[in-house]
Amino acid sequence: HNNSRDIDIAIEKNELQRIRPQLISLIEQCGWHIVTYLNSDRLVTWVCGTVHENNSADLVQLDFFYHTSIFGIVLIENKEIIKHRLFNGQVYHANKVYEFLDKYMYDRAVGATYPDKYKNTRQLVENNPQVEKLIVNIFGKNNLAVCDKANKKELLKAALKWNFHRFGWGTIANFLQFEYHHIKNYLCSNTGFSIGFTGPDGSGKTTVIDLLIENLGDVFRKAHTYYHFRPTLFGNLGEVAHSAGVKKDVDRDFSKPHRGGKTSALSSLIRLLYYSADYIIGYFMKVKSMIRITRIVIFDRYYTDIICDSRRSRIYLNSKFLHTYGQIFIPSLDYNILLTASSETILARKHELDKEGINTINKKIDYLANKKGYYKVLNESTPQEAVAKILRIVFEEQHQKNLKRMR
């Protein structure tokens, strides 16, 4: 039994391609989904997730390594790891020598030190002849102590020399393959995803978001970014106007989101254009850079909130116009969660709210619910049940997207 949430698998590239259909079929038969998928020159990553009948969620990351390399420079060939593999009665696994060298050689090649938390593994193998042989052959250093003090430039130079000796002009092909995947993943990849939450006060957004992050924590605890309403590339409109001398006083009573009075169509349009600039520029500077590398961006309220809650955004424009405008100009998130509940349930949670305001927001939510990319989720029971509904939507949609990307 393996409790790890990150499993490294050494496999030849053509072998993974051969068994991939069977692997996907097995994942689906077990009720799991491929949530994120990354393809690079040295590995393929699948983050797989499932939601159980009791509404709990599990995630596991599978890294299929073709070889240990950096910038297309091979440090350890997979065939060597597989050749010296061991069998524990259930599965084949790398021996301690290659378990150590895989991490150590990569860390040294990027200029990092071998983590102290793995010192027991190092102590087990540091005097092993196999370790010394690879350090001499690849890095040109007589032992680990010398290699520890070497800078990454001289180590990479030695590794590159060995690559030309081992692969000849194939070394150039390896580098070009690295560059191809690097540029493609930077410009075209969308391996992560974004989620936005919209709903009336009392719908439980904060609790559900916190629980969602907790449920995704095994793999995405350090791989998610949280924003409130917009990317905030630009400051609050009132603060900007105050700094420019256009406005004398700034209302900073954020405990009352619906405190402002109704604004004119012109004022609403100015606000919309200002926020649009933040959404558009901020998306490509802050959001896109995250979701292209298997990470998650979460918004507590997004542009959808402008459509649903005019009193909060103080943008009093027609809902259909705002939706059409958003489709044309505002970068869309992958999943727009319309989190709500009945007015009776919300009023039971927050007595200070007014039923008319809740119903107005819920009507706009119903208008958006059938639009592409919008998902209405009722939070009438426990927050975990709502989170489970959301994760089932996301996992299934991501799985279908990733199957298409693998074709």
Annotate each language-model stretch with its function.
Residues V208:
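Hydrophobic positions on the alpha1 helix immediately C-terminal to the Walker A/P-loop
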Residues H1-I7, I11-F193:
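Conserved NTP-donor binding/palm subdomain of two-metal-ion nucleotidyltransferases/polymerases, i.e.
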Residues L156-T171, E344-R407:
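NTP-dependent small-molecule kinase module
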Residues R301-Y367:
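A glycine- and Lys/Arg-enriched "phosphate-lid" helix/loop adjacent to the NTP-binding pocket
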Residues V219-L237:
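Short beta-strand-centered segment that lines the nucleotide-binding/catalytic pocket of NTP-utilizing
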Residues F197:
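Hydrophobic anchor at the beta1->P-loop junction of P-loop NTPases
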Residues K205:
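Conserved lysine of the Walker
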Residues P231-S313, K320:
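ATP-dependent small-molecule kinase phosphotransfer cores
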